[in-house]
């Protein structure tokens, strides 16, 4: 039980660590128009928003968050304006089918071709690159209890889709997003990959700290 509480605390800490820079960025960018020359990236959740901001540092990229604060991702219903914005974007990044079930409905409604890279797979639809950031990640199974009832709007199935709370999985997500960004904007691919390498190094250091802390809790 102690280890479970510790793991939950660490997961919450990582979530806050990833979200705080994004929250600060939102405040700084309030009222600023998008850069017409920069690549446009739409992300679904705060962790992906933070990944995208870190990966595009040093460029004129326009990173936006689709879900308003406080909105439940599982039950979110994109408006027609949201769908149009996604179609006009250069990159659309989401966590995966178990987290944003509605994302596949949007994607399936569009004509596209499958493109692959050495490090992952992404979908190209015209000029739009779609990044499923759960690719390459084995989701953890959730132990079902007979006395538990599924909550409305939380259609996880038997898997935990909150993959960004694990630093190693977060690093994989960042790598997938990097390849999508590089495909959409080859001119800045070198910058994206350099930023990704630095970001993944920070996550690896964080993971090492987690492992050391967990070892001490045994």
Residue ranges and their predicted role:
Residues 12-14, 25-218:
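Extracytoplasmic metal-acquisition and chelation regions
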Residues 2-13:
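Bacterial N-terminal signal peptides that target proteins for export
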């Amino acid at each position: 039980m102690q280890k479970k509480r510790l793991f939950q605390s660490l997961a919450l800490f990582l979530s806050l660590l990833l979200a705080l820079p994004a929250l600060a960025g939102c405040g700084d960018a309030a009222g600023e128009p998008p850069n017409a020359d920069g690549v446009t990236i739409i992300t679904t959740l705060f962790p992906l928003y933070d990944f995208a901001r870190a990966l595009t540092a040093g460029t004129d990229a326009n990173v936006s968050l689709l879900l308003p604060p406080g909105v439940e991702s599982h039950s979110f219903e994109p408006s027609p304006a949201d769908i149009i914005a996604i179609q006009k974007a250069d990159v659309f990044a989401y966590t995966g089918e178990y987290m944003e079930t509605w994302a596949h409905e949007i994607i399936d409604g569009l004509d596209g071709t499958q493109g692959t890279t050495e490090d992952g797979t992404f979908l190209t639809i015209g000029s739009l690159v779609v990044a499923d950031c759960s690719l390459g990640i084995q989701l953890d199974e959730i132990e079902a209890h007979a006395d538990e009832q599924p909550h409305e709007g939380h259609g996880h199935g038997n898997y935990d889709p909150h993959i960004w709370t694990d630093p190693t999985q977060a690093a994989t997500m960042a790598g997938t997003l990097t390849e999508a960004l590089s495909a959409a904007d080859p001119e800045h691919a070198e910058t994206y990959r350099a930023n990704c390498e630095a970001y993944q190094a920070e996550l690896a250091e964080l993971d090492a700290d987690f492992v050391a802390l967990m070892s001490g809790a045994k």
